Amino acid sequence: MLNRTVKEKILKIMELGLEVNSREKNTVFIRFSGHCEIFEVSIHSKGWKEGLGADFFKDIYFGSSSENEAWKKLDEIIEKLEKLKVN
């Protein structure tokens, strides 16, 4: 079960991802698999193009990650999205 802080960070990431995608089509991809507590974010800074990988990718397996490790990864994602939002 995800704790409150993790849920808040995930919601912040979703919000930032939607804001960035409203300016740049197909830039941020976010996936949460609740049945196995996996959260994935991929960012294509210059937009998605077939055959090109993401510039930034993070996946978190909450079931096997320590709380501090998960928070660190979530904070890295938030920082990256906030930079994209400003630019």
Features from the language model and the residues they span:
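Negatively charged, low-complexity tracts enriched in Asp/Glu with abundant Ser/Thr
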Residues: 1-38, 47-87
